[in-house]
Amino acid sequence: MSSAIFISACQKEQTSDDFTITLRLSHVFNVNEELAQSIELVAQRINEKTKGAVRILTYPGGQIATYKDGVEMVVRGAHFISVEDPSYIGDYVPEFTALVGPMLYNNFDEYMELIKTPLVKGWLKKVEDKGIKVLSLQYIFGFRNLITDKPVNTPDDLRGVKLRTPGSKLFIKTLNAMGATATPLPWGETFSALQQGVVDGLEGSEFTNLGTKVYETGKKNVAFTKHFLGTCGVYISTDVWAKIPQQYRTIIEQEFTYEAEQMIMQLKGKHAQVVKDLEAEGVKFNAIDRPAFEKRTINLYDGELPGVTVEMYDQIQTELKKIRARAAK
């Protein structure tokens, strides 16, 4: 899920007194979804706190560059900010693909604690050396589950089932490993593809299901696979970032971080009600044979994903064990 921000600024060195910048922000989320609303609040507060020096214009629904295209523009030094799943920067530093790999997290807090560790901070430095400044990794929009028209309990239930997925290699390989036939499509084409039978289902969070009315396509069964924790990072070119005065850089980072944390709190409080609202629309939920799916996806960490290694997986698991031990006290 992604954003692009075009930055217009003078090329010469400027002080915060005479610096102005206009940011065009695009993301694939529907205006009714929490992340879209959160981004809108960030834009408003940055404008207010910089007294108009940093102005952000938001464009929902992927009206400008998204996904891999947006991240590529950042890497090339274009005046964009990409808000996207960390696996897209995993194309440059594979550890970020491992960070959001399948079947890792039991809850939001585990991920939030992991990204604060020295392990992940070291990865942040590595990706900065590639020209990508990470402004935030904190955006979470819920666990991603399978949405189909029949119950899915085991990998065998997915044989021959075509599932829409984003174009990320991580998503494609994970859905295939789980037993489905991954079918990458832009989000804007998903509903027509479902209605025309091009795909049999998709994967996403309950918040996306309700906010975009996925259930109206007739796909009214949700399997609680929790195969991915839905996350987004915020990325900008290191060269572009260097042009912005420190005073404004601090505000930008603080506002993205603050609003992401607020969004997580809201999601935790809303999930149970969202499930009830979906059930009122006829959506049914079922548990899965999780060990059976984990057995299928664990091999992705051993050479199935470009650059991802078992060592990365083991490093993540070591940190998660520490985090879970602290939480259990």
Predicted segments — roles?
Residues M1-I5:
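Bacterial N-terminal signal peptides
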Residues C10-D109, L119, V127-K329:
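N-terminal secretory/targeting leader peptides
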Residues Y111, I115:
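Active-site-adjacent segment of FAD-dependent monooxygenases/related oxidoreductases
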Residues G122:
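Alpha-helical scaffold segments in soluble metabolic enzymes
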